[in-house]
Amino acid sequence: MKVLVDIDEYAEGAVLLDGLESAIVGIVQEFGNGNRVLYSKQRILEILQERDLMTMGEAEEFYDYNILGLYAGEQNAVFLDQSLEPIKNKENEWEYHAK
């Protein structure tokens, strides 16, 4: 059963990015600080390309300067970059490869 959650109540005071609601993937909890909204970087880049007709390069530049670079207080949004893939090497140690 899915439960509808009001992000404003669940992460009261957290910064929400207008127009990027479909890129929300979760809530980050940090001891001593309020909850923050977690966005998928890859989904944000897809939205910018689809909605705003940006190239990947334009979307990445816009993301870096206008979204990642935004500071709106202690409950600023945080971003998940899933471009690394953990793989065990022959010595049974973890290595990380770009997807």
What are these regions (language model features)?
Residues 1-99:
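C-terminal alpha-helical interaction appendages
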